[in-house]
Every structure is written in C-alpha cells, then in structure tokens.
A protein has these predicted regions:
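Intracellular leaflet-associated regions of eukaryotic membrane-associated proteins
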Residues: 1-196
C-alpha cells in the first residue's frame, strides 16, 4: 500500500456497524426491496382469499404462517448482523478504552500480525476492511446489503439471515403458484362452457 493511501486510510472515519450514517445505496435498496416483497406477498394473499376453496385457504394459511416466521427472523437477524461490531478484539479494546496503540496486553503468539492502518497487533485471520476502515476478526467479506463486515461472531447470524430470505422467497413463489392454480381452475369451467 502506498504511503499516501495509508495516510488517507488512517484519517478516514471507522464504521463500527452498518447503522452508521450515511447508509450505502445498496443498503437502501435492500430495505426497500424487503418492504416491497412483503407488500407483494400481502397483495397476493388478498387476491387468493377472494376466490379460494377450503383446501387453498388451508394451504395459504400454512404458507402465510411460514412467511410470517421467515419475515420476523429476517428482520431480527438482519438487525443483529447490521448492528454487530466484528472488530478484532485488540482493536475493539483499544478503541473502547481510548488507549494509545499497542498498550493493551496481548499474547505475542496469538497476535503475531500487525495492521499498519489500525497501528496494532491483530489475530492471524483478521483482515482490514477498506470500506469500514477497521480490522475485522475472521473476516469473510464486506456485505453491501447490510453495510457491515461479515465474519467472526456475526457469521452465524448472517447465514440465518440468508436462510430467512431464502424461505421468504420460496414461500412467495409457492404462494404465486397457488394463485395461478386458482386462477386456472376458475377459468377452466368457463372455457368448457364455451365449447358446449
């Protein structure tokens, strides 16, 4: 890294979590997209209820329950991932105690790597995120959808969030398929009457 880039990174504000202002464009897109998905599902359910038979209503009730659970889980896990601070423990400790760099005691064997930007020793699988400008423990990637680094303690919540979104989309597809079946069944007797 060039010396000028190093100075620029040291002078850039550290993002501790994904709720810090301003949100990225992709974060806003994800929030709006999630709201639109829920609204689209509610509209699909409203249109199915009007023409559904008993079996379709039971199926719709089960799908809606699963969808509701998935939405609640998605909101909870998205909040947890976005609000978390996956910083390296030494970096977080120095930041929380406002100590001078390198004054925190650490095990030389565990903290054998040094970050020139954070000016501290870090664990071997810690990487410096150029977007958040912090060293993140067990860094996997920076997620633009939540505006936070993924790794360490928030990795499991990230997988749970993705699973919740997958279940939401799967239920949405199944509900739209049910809607198409109901529409087809409703139109089928009319087409048979025309042939008579």
């Amino acid at each position: 890294m060039s010396p000028s880039r190093l100075i620029e990174m040291k002078n850039t504000k550290v993002r501790l979590h994904g709720f810090e202002w301003p949100p990225s464009c992709m974060q806003v897109v994800s929030w709006v997209g999630a709201i639109l998905l829920v609204v689209a599902y509610a509209l699909a359910v409203a249109s199915i209820v009007q023409d559904a038979d008993t079996f379709s209503l039971v199926a719709l009730g089960l799908l809606s329950f699963v969808y509701l659970v998935a939405v609640v889980c998605m909101v909870i896990y998205t909040y947890r991932v976005t609000a978390s601070d996956p910083s390296d423990p030494t970096v977080a400790l120095e930041r929380s105690h406002h100590l001078q760099p390198n004054l925190v005691e650490f095990n030389q064997l565990d903290y054998s790597y040094f970050c020139d930007i954070c000016n501290t020793h870090v664990l071997p699988d810690t990487k410096h995120c150029s977007v958040c400008n912090r060293c993140s423990y067990s860094f996997d990637h920076h997620c633009v959808w939540v505006g936070n680094d993924i790794g360490g303690e928030n990795y499991v919540d990230f997988i749970r969030m993705l699973t919740s979104v997958f279940v939401m989309l799967l239920v949405q597809i199944l509900t739209l398929t049910l809607q198409l079946v109901i529409i087809e069944a409703k139109e089928q007797p009319q087409s048979e009457m025309k042939t008579l």
